[in-house]
Amino acid sequence: MGLTGKDRGQRVCYVPTAVGDSPVAIEAMTSTFATQRPDVDVSVLCLFNQPSVPDICEHLLSRDLILVEGGSVVNLVAVWRAHGLPEVMRECWEAGVVLAGASAGSLCWHQGGPTDSFGDSLDPFTEGLGFLPFSNGVHDDFDDQPRRETYRALIAEGTLSAGYATEDGVGLHYVGTRLHEAVTIRPAARAWWVEADGAGGYAERSIVPRVLAALADDRTFQG
């Protein structure tokens, strides 16, 4: 929120396309803002079964921050393209609107990354918006899926471009197309730069995120 340049009264648009505009997700997000940040003006852009605002471009350009929900990145990007959202999002980005999101809401801005949108297995997704010229490996420390291994294998074989992986609780802050810093709400979590090594394998570099001071106690995120 601080990246908007405002301390209070930010105008935020929540975009839950990746979860099919789930009423449960919408209620959870709007309730969280109402409880924790009642000063924030929160709108919701739904696209099922038709857009919830008369002019998508005008509405999004009026926001300080666009927050994209996680879920199916394949469905998200397909629906966005049907409604002309990639062009609108680029216009917002170039106008200085902060673009944000987690999971699919992070992956969508990149070139691609592993996804379980097609089924239980992890498959390469290469149809991201590509605003950021990197791949993105989200949930890099998941125990129930081999996301770490899959992301690195896809980069090693050339299916995905070099990019950034993030363990849960880590965010990537870009300025333009340059990574400014990684931040985290989990002090032990890491981000990683991963690239092909030219010999059929990969090379990686650990990135130690800046811990967000107000959220540095891991106990806050248990349960």
Predicted feature locations:
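C-terminal and late-domain segments of enzyme folds
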Residues: M1-R8, Y14-T35, L65, G113-T115, ...
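Class I SAM-dependent methyltransferase SAM-binding "motif I" and its flanking Rossmann-like core
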Residues: E69, N75-Q145
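Portal/gating segments that form or line small-molecule/metal binding sites
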Residues: C13-Y14, V19-N75, V79
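Residue-level recognition of the N-termini of beta-strands and the immediately preceding loop/turn
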Residues: Q10-R11, V97
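General beta-strand structural signal in soluble alpha/beta enzymes
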Residues: V44-L45, L67-V68, L99-A102, G163-T166
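Alpha-helix/helix-capping structural signal
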Residues: G71, A104-G105, V170, T177
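Hydrophobic anchor at the start of a short beta-strand
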Residues: V40-V42, L99, A191
